[in-house]
Every structure is written in C-alpha cells, then in structure tokens.
Design a protein with these regions (language model features):
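N-terminal secretory signal peptides that target proteins for export/translocation
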Residues: 1-4
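Bacterial N-terminal signal peptides
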Residues: 8-18
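C-terminal "post-core" interaction segments
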Residues: 22-209
C-alpha cells in the first residue's frame, strides 16, 4: 500500500509543475492565413516549427521588456523563420525594451520582416501608425479584456445602423427604452494592428502571399 506521505509528495510536485508551466500566449485568427500572437514571455511565446508557406504572423512586442539573452533568442528565431512568402509583422512601440528594439532594427533590414508601430522617442518603425499613447494602451488592453479583435480594427463597429425599420420605430418606445440598451461605446482602434492587417490584405490582393 502506498503511504499517505507519498501522495502528498506527488501532489506537491504536480502543483509545482503546474505553477511553473507558462501560460498559453494570446492568439487570434484574423483569416486568410493571418495569425496574431501577443508575446508576453520571451522566448516561450514564440511559435514553434518551421514557417508554413502563405502563413503570416503578427507578433506583438509592445510593452515587453526582455533581457539581452531573450533578445538574442528572438534574433535567431526570426532569422530561421522569416521569409518573403511567410512574412513576420512585428509590432513594437516606444515602451518596448531597448534590447528588443535593437533586434527589431537589425531584422528590419532583412527579407520577410516588417516592423510596425506608433513612432516615439527612440523608436522609428518601418511602417508607422498614428495613435496617442493612451489610446494605444487602451486598445492593447481591450484585447486582454476579451474584446473581439475585429472590433479593434474597424471604425465605429458598434454604431447603430440607420435603416427603414429604425426610422419607422415609434418615438414613444424609443423614449421608454432603458439606458442599458444604449449602444456600447466601441473600443479604441488599435492603429498598429490595423496597419498590419491592412498590409496583409493588400499583399494578398496583389498575390504576393
């Protein structure tokens, strides 16, 4: 018979392994072979395996600070993974760590990589997006809160549609409608992510992917 103490030891190690296991990265499928991956733990969150022809990855390094060793791992991974038929769109901003930004500047000179973001002190992307820092942060956080990714790419996604039915709706009923039924304000547009999305769709339209 196995002693109770053995069960306790086994339970302890199982709990320790569960605690040590990294959380799965936040990913979203944007369609047409485009996948978004938010990098919060480097290098653990980097996708594994070789590139798939026709697949494009958006890797989001915004607000991530990583050490020199992690940045060096990213450099090796990008050099192995990036190519013109399976490009990498790398999102960064002024708050991305200095070691990571140094790597991004280096890989941007190669083929198959495009660095995209809102310019700021010490950060000049290849493809610039326009956004205020507070709006960018709010849009970035909205995805963590569970907002649909497409709502961060489309202007006024929550705007009520004005059609014949709404025009014929009795005014009295409109006045009696509870405030809770009001249209939910749309989250801010994620300008950098939107820029990457539009670039991908343009390349697809030109049959370059």
């Amino acid at each position: 018979m196995i002693r109770t103490g053995a069960f306790q030891v086994a339970a302890f190690w199982l709990a320790a392994l569960a605690t040590a296991a990294p959380a799965a990265p936040l990913t979203r499928d944007l369609g047409d072979g485009l996948t978004y991956v938010r990098i919060r733990d480097l290098p653990a969150d980097l996708p594994g395996g070789a590139a798939v022809p026709g697949q494009t990855l958006i890797l989001d390094f915004r607000y991530l600070v990583a050490g020199r060793d992690a940045a060096a791992t990213l450099l090796a991974w990008v050099e192995f993974r990036a190519n013109a038929r399976s490009p990498l769109f790398l999102l960064a901003n002024r708050e991305t760590g200095a070691d990571l930004n140094a790597v991004l500047r280096r890989v941007s000179r190669g083929k198959g990589c495009v660095v995209i973001g809102v310019p700021g002190p010490g950060f000049e992307p290849q493809l610039a997006a326009k956004s205020e820092p507070a709006a960018e942060r709010e849009a970035y956080s909205a995805l963590e809160r569970g907002e649909p990714v497409m709502s961060l790419l489309t202007e006024n996604p929550g705007k009520a549609r004005l059609d014949e039915a709404s025009l014929n709706h009795p005014p009295a009923e409109e006045e009696d409608a509870p405030a809770a039924d009001a249209v939910k304000p749309a989250p801010p547009i994620d300008a950098a992510l939107q820029r990457a999305f539009h670039l991908h769709r343009s390349l697809r339209a030109l049959r370059r992917l």
